[in-house]
Amino acid sequence: MAVRTAGLTQLLAELDTIAGVSGAEEEVAEFVKGELEGCYDAFHRDALGNHFFTKEGTNPQLNLMLSAHMDEVGFVIHHVDEKGFGYFTPVGLHDDRTLANQVLTVHTEKGPIQGLTGGKPAHIVSKEEAQKAPPISEIYLDFGTRDREETEELGVRVGDYVTFERPGQLLNGGRLFTGKAVDDRAGVAVMIEVMRRLRGNDLETSVHAVATVQEEVGIRGAGPAAFRVKPDVALAIDVTLAGGTPGIEDRQLPVKIGEGPAIKFFDWAPGLGMIGNNVPKRLTSRLVAIAEEHHIPYQREVLFNGATDGWAMSLSGEGVATGTISLPSRYTHSAIGCVCPEDLAGAVDLISAFVEEFKAPL
């Protein structure tokens, strides 16, 4: 592990371990608050659960907002049958292909409970069934119990959130970190490191680092957060889809893992209600100039079928000039999301330089 990225990788590993499905981000928030101790002058928590960490600048009229969402995609228990098996529904966008034969953790009032995602053995599935992934409606959790009463004695109840049971790790000690919640704990780690780097600096702008909630279920937290801050400029920090793997053409996903953070120019998700963000040219030009001036490797990104906190922030109040710094990621919205710590370190460099040089509205 490179010395430059060792601390960032360890921070990401700790963040990834914490459970924080959309709507249940409290443990992540407490961890973030602890990691940012000494890095902010003011703190606020709003009714939704967004956490605001403000480092005050010398110009009270200048405000810059950073956002990274704390929540991860997961599941929620919606039924326990008479035999004690639990059924669940997704919280956020999931790929049913990833769910078979997994260990999941149910986060009950009594504590975490493990269950196995069960289904028919391969020996008895039909040819038609063997050709497709079972839909989530046919997948259940096996707790090793004999009936509903025993399952409920474990603490499992309708409404309990569920996550993958999998520790994050640096893959083979190499260049990729893989975990269940790199979307967007990778962005949270970057935001924490930026605030740490800025800790002793006298800045003209106030910096509002906001750990947001419920991004994965409709980008619900960032809009109210930006409404509170009323920033001159905002930057979302989030993962993006990386190509470079078998079956994906470069023209589909040209951003590559390990080639630096991506400066987003445009994103659009028509399937999610036509949401997206056309980043103002004056902002992308400034980010590109800073990356080149500081010799920070970067990529240019246009993304279809995806969006970030940037969409909601851009539409807040009278409108906010909003960009996104993207962290290339493989296998997003699965238990094995991957990012490259070097890309994260580059994002820290780029965002820190942008903040330090931000002295007037764009």
What are these regions (language model features)?
Residues 1-362:
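N-terminal hydrophobic/helix-forming segments and targeting peptides
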